[in-house]
Amino acid sequence: MGCIKSKEDKGPSIKYRTEPKPDPGSQYGADPTQATQSPGIKGPAPNFNSHSMTPFGGSSGITPFGGASSIFSPTPVPYPGGLTGGVTVFVALYDYEARTTEDLSFRKGERFQIINNTEGDWWEARSIATGKTGYIPSNYVAPADSIQAEEWYFGKMGRKDAERLLLNPGNQRGTFLVRESETTKGAYSLSIRDWDEVRGDNVKHYKIRKLDNGGYYITTRAQFESLQKLVKHYSEHADGLCYRLTTVCPSVKPQTQGLAKDAWEIPRESLRLDVKLGQGCFGEVWIGTWNGTTKVAIKTLKPGTMMPEAFLQEAQIMKKLRHDKLVPLYAVVSEEPIYIVTEYMIKGSLLDFLKEGNGKYLKLPQLVDMAAQIADGMAYIERMNYIHRDLRAANILVGDNLVCKIADFGLARLIEDNEYTARQGAKFPIKWTAPEAALYGRFTIKSDVWSFGILLTELVAKGRVPYPGMVNREVLEQVERGYRMPCPQRCPESLHELMKLCWKKDPDERPTFEYIQSFLEDYFTATEPQYQPGDNL
C-alpha cells in the first residue's frame, strides 16, 4: 500500500485451459521393494480404502508442530482429551521468551500441564519443572510422547515447502522430515534430500501408509508398530530408499498467533519506533519494539488516510487470514494516527530486494520459486473469498532463505484519499491494475490475477517499473486497445505465456491462483525441463 513513482508488441493470442495437476503418485519415490527382507511387524494385508485419521492430523485447526511452513487455520480447534483438568502433558517444541508479565518463558523440551485451552492461540499452562503458571503460545507445544512432539515431524506441510526446507544450504544428503500426505487422508510422506549426477541436489518423497491394525509401512514387506520405529529403521539402513536417513531437517521457529494473549488493540505507548525503513504517500514503515521485548514491523498511517472504524472492522477480518505466505497481522493502534503491527521480515520488500539487495543476482529457478510462493499465498486468499487489491513487488516481503510473504492485503479498499479513490494520478498503481478495476472500480480476485502477471515482470526484470517509458494515462489507453508488454529479455516464452493468460481482457478467462501455483511449482519438471542457467537468468 502506497504511492507509485513512475514516469512493447502484442504476443500471440493463446487460449487458457485448465490443465490437470500432475498425478500425485508421480511425486513419490519408487516403492523400495527390491532390498532384502528387513525386521518389522507382521500384519494383515493393507486395506487402502480404510485410512484412519490420527487424532492430531488432517485438517485440525491447531498446527503445533511448527516447521517453516505450517499453515494455521483461522479457527483453531482444541486438542481432544480433558485438557481443562491439566491431565494431558505437553512438551515445548521451541524456546520462548516471555513478552509480558502474564507469559511463561520456557525452553525446548520443557513439559507443561495445560490448565485452560479454550482461548485457542494462547493457553494457560503450568510448568512441571518450575511450578510457574502463565500463558504459552499453543503452536509452540505438542502432546508429550506423541508424533507431533518428534523433531522430524513437520505436520501439515506441502511437497514444495518440504523441498524448499530440505534444499536450504547446509543440509546434507539424507536430511529428512515426515509430514502429512497431501494426497492421501491419514497417510504421511517421508521427504529426503538426495543427490545424483543427473539432477544434482534433489528431494525424494515416499508415502508412508497406515495399516488397519495401526502399523506403518513404505513397502508392505517392512512394517512397523509406530512411525518412530519406521524412522529408526531407515536411519540405520537405506533398505531400498534413495539414501539412509541421517539428519533431521532444521525447522524454523513459527510466528506466534498475535503478540500475546489479549494483545490486539494495543496502546501507542507500548510501541517504540526504532529504525525508519521507508516512506510512502500514506505513511511510514518502521522496525519497532513492542512492550520492550518483541521486534516488530510498524506501519504508521497519516491521519485521514482511512476511517478508524472501517479500518478496525477490516483488521478483524485480516487477522483471521492465516497462512505461512501471508505476513501475520499482530496488533493495531486503532486511533489516529493508525499503527499496524506485523511480523518483521529481515530482507524488506521484494522490490527493494530485487533492485538493491542480493535479489539482483538471482537466477530463474529462484525467481520462479518466489513467484510460486506468492501464488500459494494468493491461492489461499482466493479460497477465503478475499481480495488483495494492491498486489505488486512493493507489497511482498522477503525473509531468510528467500521466503516470500504477502503484505497489505485488503488495505487499499479503505484509503480515503480523493486522488487515490478516483483511480488516477501518481498515488494510484495504474500499471499494476486490471483495466476493469482501473476504469470501473471492479476489483475481484481476477483483477488480482492481472496484477500477479505484472508482478511476474517485476521479478524477471529485477524490479524494473512495468511498461518502461510509458506514463499512467498512456498505459491505460494502450492496454484498452489490446497492448500487452512483450516478453522480458531472457525470459522463457512459456513464462510470458502465463503472463498473457493473467492479462486476458475478460476476467473470467484468466487462470485461478490455484492453477498458477501448480504451474509454477512444477515449472522445471513439466514446462521447462531442459532449462540451463545463463549469464542473466
From Swiss-Prot:
<keyword id="KW-0519">Myristate</keyword>
<dbReference type="InterPro" id="IPR050198">
    <property type="entry name" value="Non-receptor_tyrosine_kinases"/>
</dbReference>
<comment type="similarity">
    <text>Belongs to the protein kinase superfamily. Tyr protein kinase family. SRC subfamily.</text>
</comment>
<feature type="active site" description="Proton acceptor">
    <location>
        <position position="390"/>
    </location>
</feature>
<keyword id="KW-0067">ATP-binding</keyword>
<comment type="function">
    <text>Non-receptor protein tyrosine kinase that is involved in the regulation of cell growth and survival, apoptosis, cell-cell adhesion, cytoskeleton remodeling, differentiation, G2/M progression and cytokinesis.</text>
</comment>
<feature type="compositionally biased region" description="Basic and acidic residues">
    <location>
        <begin position="1"/>
        <end position="22"/>
    </location>
</feature>
<keyword id="KW-0963">Cytoplasm</keyword>
<dbReference type="GO" id="GO:0005886">
    <property type="term" value="C:plasma membrane"/>
</dbReference>
<dbReference type="InterPro" id="IPR036028">
    <property type="entry name" value="SH3-like_dom_sf"/>
</dbReference>
<keyword id="KW-1003">Cell membrane</keyword>
<dbReference type="GO" id="GO:0005524">
    <property type="term" value="F:ATP binding"/>
</dbReference>
<keyword id="KW-0808">Transferase</keyword>
<keyword id="KW-0564">Palmitate</keyword>
<feature type="region of interest" description="Disordered">
    <location>
        <begin position="1"/>
        <end position="60"/>
    </location>
</feature>
<dbReference type="InterPro" id="IPR001245">
    <property type="entry name" value="Ser-Thr/Tyr_kinase_cat_dom"/>
</dbReference>
<dbReference type="GO" id="GO:0005813">
    <property type="term" value="C:centrosome"/>
</dbReference>
<dbReference type="InterPro" id="IPR020635">
    <property type="entry name" value="Tyr_kinase_cat_dom"/>
</dbReference>
<dbReference type="Pfam" id="PF07714">
    <property type="entry name" value="PK_Tyr_Ser-Thr"/>
</dbReference>
<protein>
    <recommendedName>
        <fullName>Tyrosine-protein kinase Yes</fullName>
        <ecNumber>2.7.10.2</ecNumber>
    </recommendedName>
</protein>
<keyword id="KW-0829">Tyrosine-protein kinase</keyword>
<keyword id="KW-0472">Membrane</keyword>
<feature type="modified residue" description="Phosphotyrosine; by CSK">
    <location>
        <position position="531"/>
    </location>
</feature>
<feature type="modified residue" description="Phosphotyrosine; by autocatalysis">
    <location>
        <position position="420"/>
    </location>
</feature>
<dbReference type="InterPro" id="IPR001452">
    <property type="entry name" value="SH3_domain"/>
</dbReference>
<keyword id="KW-0449">Lipoprotein</keyword>
<dbReference type="InterPro" id="IPR036860">
    <property type="entry name" value="SH2_dom_sf"/>
</dbReference>
<keyword id="KW-0965">Cell junction</keyword>
<dbReference type="InterPro" id="IPR017441">
    <property type="entry name" value="Protein_kinase_ATP_BS"/>
</dbReference>
<dbReference type="GO" id="GO:0005829">
    <property type="term" value="C:cytosol"/>
</dbReference>
<dbReference type="InterPro" id="IPR000719">
    <property type="entry name" value="Prot_kinase_dom"/>
</dbReference>
<feature type="domain" description="SH3">
    <location>
        <begin position="85"/>
        <end position="146"/>
    </location>
</feature>
<feature type="domain" description="SH2">
    <location>
        <begin position="152"/>
        <end position="249"/>
    </location>
</feature>
<feature type="lipid moiety-binding region" description="N-myristoyl glycine">
    <location>
        <position position="2"/>
    </location>
</feature>
<dbReference type="GO" id="GO:0030154">
    <property type="term" value="P:cell differentiation"/>
</dbReference>
<keyword id="KW-0206">Cytoskeleton</keyword>
<dbReference type="GO" id="GO:0007169">
    <property type="term" value="P:cell surface receptor protein tyrosine kinase signaling pathway"/>
</dbReference>
<dbReference type="GO" id="GO:0005102">
    <property type="term" value="F:signaling receptor binding"/>
</dbReference>
<feature type="binding site">
    <location>
        <position position="299"/>
    </location>
    <ligand>
        <name>ATP</name>
    </ligand>
</feature>
<keyword id="KW-0597">Phosphoprotein</keyword>
<feature type="lipid moiety-binding region" description="S-palmitoyl cysteine; in membrane form">
    <location>
        <position position="3"/>
    </location>
</feature>
<keyword id="KW-0727">SH2 domain</keyword>
